[in-house]
A protein has these predicted regions:
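Acidic, metal-coordinating helix/loop segments flanking the phosphotransfer/catalytic sites
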Residues: 36, 48-68, 107-108
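Negatively charged, flexible loop motifs adjacent to catalytic sites
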Residues: 102-106
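Charged docking surfaces used in two-component/phosphorelay signaling
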Residues: 33-41
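Acidic catalytic/metal-coordinating carboxylates
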Residues: 50-51, 76-83
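Non-catalytic signal-transmission and effector/linker regions of two-component phosphorelay proteins
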Residues: 1-23, 36, 60, 64-65, ...
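Conserved acidic carboxylate
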Residues: 26
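As written
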Residues: 80, 111-120
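Active-site residues of response regulator receiver
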Residues: 72, 100
Length: 155
Protein backbone atom coordinates (compact mmCIF):
# COMPACT_ATOMS: atom_id res chain seq x y z
CA UNK A 1 0.00 0.00 0.00
CA UNK A 2 1.25 3.49 -0.73
CA UNK A 3 1.75 6.10 1.93
CA UNK A 4 -0.98 8.56 2.86
CA UNK A 5 -0.88 10.79 5.91
CA UNK A 6 -3.37 10.27 8.72
CA UNK A 7 -5.08 13.54 7.87
CA UNK A 8 -5.39 12.55 4.19
CA UNK A 9 -6.97 9.22 5.14
CA UNK A 10 -9.38 10.73 7.65
CA UNK A 11 -10.26 13.52 5.26
CA UNK A 12 -10.90 11.14 2.39
CA UNK A 13 -13.20 8.82 4.33
CA UNK A 14 -15.21 11.59 5.96
CA UNK A 15 -15.64 13.46 2.69
CA UNK A 16 -16.69 10.33 0.82
CA UNK A 17 -18.87 8.43 3.26
CA UNK A 18 -20.82 8.39 6.47
CA UNK A 19 -19.30 6.75 9.55
CA UNK A 20 -19.57 3.01 9.10
CA UNK A 21 -18.73 -0.31 10.71
CA UNK A 22 -16.81 -2.79 8.59
CA UNK A 23 -16.46 -6.51 9.24
CA UNK A 24 -12.96 -7.31 7.94
CA UNK A 25 -12.18 -10.97 7.30
CA UNK A 26 -8.58 -11.81 6.32
CA UNK A 27 -6.63 -14.92 7.22
CA UNK A 28 -3.18 -13.37 6.62
CA UNK A 29 -2.24 -11.53 9.85
CA UNK A 30 -0.04 -8.89 8.19
CA UNK A 31 -2.65 -8.03 5.55
CA UNK A 32 -5.39 -7.95 8.20
CA UNK A 33 -3.32 -5.63 10.40
CA UNK A 34 -2.41 -3.16 7.64
CA UNK A 35 -5.93 -3.15 6.21
CA UNK A 36 -7.46 -2.60 9.63
CA UNK A 37 -5.10 0.28 10.36
CA UNK A 38 -5.86 1.94 7.02
CA UNK A 39 -9.62 1.65 7.57
CA UNK A 40 -9.43 2.94 11.15
CA UNK A 41 -7.24 5.84 10.08
CA UNK A 42 -9.89 6.47 7.43
CA UNK A 43 -12.48 6.94 10.16
CA UNK A 44 -14.20 3.56 10.04
CA UNK A 45 -15.00 1.23 12.95
CA UNK A 46 -13.45 -2.14 12.14
CA UNK A 47 -14.43 -5.55 13.49
CA UNK A 48 -11.60 -7.87 12.42
CA UNK A 49 -11.75 -11.64 12.09
CA UNK A 50 -8.99 -14.07 11.16
CA UNK A 51 -11.32 -16.39 9.29
CA UNK A 52 -14.89 -17.39 8.48
CA UNK A 53 -15.69 -18.96 11.88
CA UNK A 54 -14.73 -15.86 13.85
CA UNK A 55 -16.48 -13.66 11.27
CA UNK A 56 -19.72 -15.62 11.60
CA UNK A 57 -19.68 -15.17 15.40
CA UNK A 58 -18.99 -11.44 15.09
CA UNK A 59 -21.73 -11.09 12.48
CA UNK A 60 -24.26 -12.74 14.81
CA UNK A 61 -23.28 -10.51 17.73
CA UNK A 62 -22.99 -7.28 15.75
CA UNK A 63 -25.34 -7.81 12.77
CA UNK A 64 -27.23 -4.54 13.29
CA UNK A 65 -23.99 -2.56 13.40
CA UNK A 66 -22.26 -3.96 10.31
CA UNK A 67 -22.46 -1.77 7.21
CA UNK A 68 -19.95 -3.56 4.98
CA UNK A 69 -18.40 -7.02 4.78
CA UNK A 70 -14.80 -6.75 3.54
CA UNK A 71 -13.51 -10.28 3.06
CA UNK A 72 -10.73 -12.17 1.40
CA UNK A 73 -11.95 -14.49 -1.35
CA UNK A 74 -9.59 -17.41 -0.76
CA UNK A 75 -9.38 -18.65 2.84
CA UNK A 76 -8.96 -22.07 4.45
CA UNK A 77 -12.21 -23.92 5.07
CA UNK A 78 -14.62 -21.49 3.44
CA UNK A 79 -14.22 -18.93 0.67
CA UNK A 80 -15.46 -15.35 0.78
CA UNK A 81 -18.63 -15.93 -1.26
CA UNK A 82 -19.57 -18.86 1.01
CA UNK A 83 -19.02 -16.67 4.08
CA UNK A 84 -21.10 -13.84 2.63
CA UNK A 85 -24.20 -16.05 2.44
CA UNK A 86 -24.87 -16.49 6.22
CA UNK A 87 -23.74 -12.94 6.98
CA UNK A 88 -26.19 -11.61 4.39
CA UNK A 89 -28.96 -13.74 5.91
CA UNK A 90 -28.47 -11.71 9.09
CA UNK A 91 -28.33 -8.41 7.19
CA UNK A 92 -29.79 -8.77 3.66
CA UNK A 93 -28.96 -5.23 2.51
CA UNK A 94 -25.26 -5.75 3.22
CA UNK A 95 -22.86 -5.04 0.39
CA UNK A 96 -19.73 -7.16 0.24
CA UNK A 97 -16.32 -6.03 -0.93
CA UNK A 98 -14.17 -9.03 -1.85
CA UNK A 99 -10.38 -8.77 -1.66
CA UNK A 100 -8.53 -11.11 -3.97
CA UNK A 101 -4.95 -11.71 -4.97
CA UNK A 102 -6.18 -13.89 -7.81
CA UNK A 103 -7.89 -12.96 -11.02
CA UNK A 104 -10.14 -15.99 -10.58
CA UNK A 105 -13.14 -15.25 -12.76
CA UNK A 106 -15.01 -18.30 -11.45
CA UNK A 107 -14.78 -17.21 -7.81
CA UNK A 108 -15.92 -13.70 -8.71
CA UNK A 109 -18.75 -15.14 -10.84
CA UNK A 110 -19.92 -17.16 -7.84
CA UNK A 111 -19.70 -14.06 -5.70
CA UNK A 112 -21.95 -12.19 -8.12
CA UNK A 113 -24.59 -14.88 -7.67
CA UNK A 114 -24.56 -14.27 -3.92
CA UNK A 115 -25.86 -10.70 -4.08
CA UNK A 116 -24.58 -7.15 -4.32
CA UNK A 117 -20.82 -7.00 -4.15
CA UNK A 118 -17.71 -5.32 -5.41
CA UNK A 119 -14.12 -6.49 -5.44
CA UNK A 120 -10.64 -5.06 -5.07
CA UNK A 121 -7.48 -6.66 -6.42
CA UNK A 122 -4.57 -7.26 -4.01
CA UNK A 123 -2.14 -5.69 -3.56
CA UNK A 124 -4.04 -2.42 -3.26
CA UNK A 125 -3.10 1.08 -2.17
CA UNK A 126 -4.60 2.79 0.86
CA UNK A 127 -6.21 5.28 -1.49
CA UNK A 128 -7.81 2.58 -3.68
CA UNK A 129 -9.01 0.66 -0.60
CA UNK A 130 -10.67 3.73 0.91
CA UNK A 131 -12.17 4.67 -2.46
CA UNK A 132 -13.67 1.20 -2.99
CA UNK A 133 -15.03 1.09 0.56
CA UNK A 134 -16.57 4.56 0.18
CA UNK A 135 -18.10 3.61 -3.19
CA UNK A 136 -19.56 0.38 -1.80
CA UNK A 137 -21.06 2.16 1.20
CA UNK A 138 -22.43 4.99 -0.93
CA UNK A 139 -24.13 2.48 -3.23
CA UNK A 140 -25.67 0.72 -0.23
CA UNK A 141 -26.91 3.92 1.37
CA UNK A 142 -28.27 5.26 -1.93
CA UNK A 143 -30.19 2.02 -2.47
CA UNK A 144 -31.53 2.10 1.10
CA UNK A 145 -32.61 5.74 0.74
CA UNK A 146 -34.34 4.97 -2.55
CA UNK A 147 -36.29 2.11 -0.93
CA UNK A 148 -37.28 4.26 2.06
CA UNK A 149 -38.33 7.28 -0.02
CA UNK A 150 -42.06 7.89 -0.06
CA UNK A 151 -43.82 6.47 -3.09
CA UNK A 152 -46.15 8.91 -4.80
CA UNK A 153 -48.91 7.75 -7.13
CA UNK A 154 -48.58 8.58 -10.81
CA UNK A 155 -50.94 11.31 -12.05
Amino acid sequence: MTEMTSNEMRGYATSQSLPATILLVEDEPAVRHVTREALEMGGYRVLAADGPDAATHIARDESNAIDLLLTDVVMPGMNGPELARPVRELRPELVTLFMTGYADAEVLRLAMLEGPHKHIQKPFTVHSLLARVADALAARWNDRDRKQAPQYPSP
